[in-house]
Each structure stands twice: as structure tokens, then as C-alpha cells.
Amino acid sequence: MASLPVQFTRNQISSPFFSVNLRREPRSLVTVHCSAGENRENGEGVKKSLFPLKELGSIACAALCACTLTIASPVIAANQRLPPLSTEPDRCEKAFVGNTIGQANGVYDKPLDLRFCDYTNDQTNLKGKTLSAALMVGAKFDGADMTEVVMSKAYAVEASFKGVNFTNAVIDRVNFGKSNLKGAVFRNTVLSGSTFEEANLEDVVFEDTIIGYIDLQKICRNESINEEGRLVLGCR
């Protein structure tokens, strides 16, 4: 088996047959430059014997380019994930109408931008609404009645849902990362594909919750769930 010596530096990866220069551009982009190294050996026989290694160098270079793009992609995606905050004066009130297009599939003609809106203790306007693909970052729903709501593909990172009643709701593929759900009630609630990474699930009520096995395993990793909640969920 032939081996291909490769040297690594901070901005360059090289071997006798190829080199890759990595240069970071503005906006977290990475530029990759590949070049073939010169064969300094003399003799046709030696050149022929090294030819497969040159091909390996080209393949390795292409693989490194693909790897670099893969590494860079999450950074680009993170920077471009959310659109600019809506400047519409009534954007928070649009939650009272909901997003009626696409519904459970989270398809919408225009983002439902509820970021940083305050719906604290709202007992009437949110009940039964469809909030598909809603942007809820930093929003406050503390004490609100959100029974029978449909939240499909909503992005609720760092939002507050303390004491919210989610009875009979469909919480499908919602990102609750770092959100505060202390004392929230998930009774007869569908929790399919939703994530709660670093969320506060203290004193959350899970009663007759419909949840898949894989999703259950992920929720059970959250250490803020009390013993009663873990028992109801069936966490091991």
C-alpha cells in the first residue's frame, strides 16, 4: 500500500504532489486553492511509478475541498438562518390571526415574525391558532393559553413559555433551544420532532403526551426535568 506524506500548517495542507491553501474571506467564507506539486525526480520509470500518487494527490485535494465546504456551511447557515426583524407595526398582532397557509407542513407565503413580542397572560387570542414556521426568538408567552395551537417548524429559541397551557396542541418540529418552559403543561400534546436543548423544563407537566421514542430519549437528557416528570415520560 502506498502512503502519501502530508504536512499540515495553519493555513496550508501540502504533500510532494499537491498543496491546499486555505484563506478566510469576509463573512466567514473559506477560499481553497489547490495546486499540483512538481515531480523533481529524474527518469521516466520513476515518473511512471509516481503517477498513481499524483492521482491520489488530486483526489485528496478534492476531498479536502469538500470537507472545507462542509465545515464552512454551518457558519454560513447560522448567519443567514433568520431574516431581518420585520418592521411592520402590527407584526405581533398577526399571531392572533395565525398562519393559515401550509399549516402543519410549516409552509408559508411570508414569515410570521413574533420575535420579542409579549403575549404574557393572554387567555383568548392565541388559543387554537396555527403558528406554523413562526419566528419566536425572545418572545414572551408566560401564562398564556395556547391550547390546541399548531406550532409546526416554529423557531422558539430563547423564548419564554413559563406556565403556558399546551393542552391538545400540536408541537411539531419546534426548536425550543434555551427556552424557559418552567411549569408549562403538555397534556395530550403531540411533541413530534421537537428539540429542547438547554431549555428549562423544571416542573413541566407531561401527561398523555404523544412522543416518539427517539424524541423521548433526547428530552430525557435534559437534567432540569424533575423526578415526577421523568417518571411520567418513562425516562430511564
UniProtKB/Swiss-Prot annotation:
Domain of life assignment: Eukaryota
Pfam family membership, one: Pentapeptide
Record-linked SUPFAM superfamilies: Pentapeptide repeat-like
Domain Pentapeptide repeat: 124-163, 169-208
Alphabetized InterPro entries for the sequence: 5peptide_repeat
GO cellular component: chloroplast thylakoid lumen
Keyword line: Chloroplast, Plastid, Repeat, Thylakoid, Transit peptide
Compartment(s) of residence: Plastid, Chloroplast thylakoid lumen
Subunit structure: Interacts in vitro with LTO1.
Protein name according to UniProt: Thylakoid lumenal 17.4 kDa protein, chloroplastic
Source organism per UniProt: Arabidopsis thaliana
Originating gene: TL17
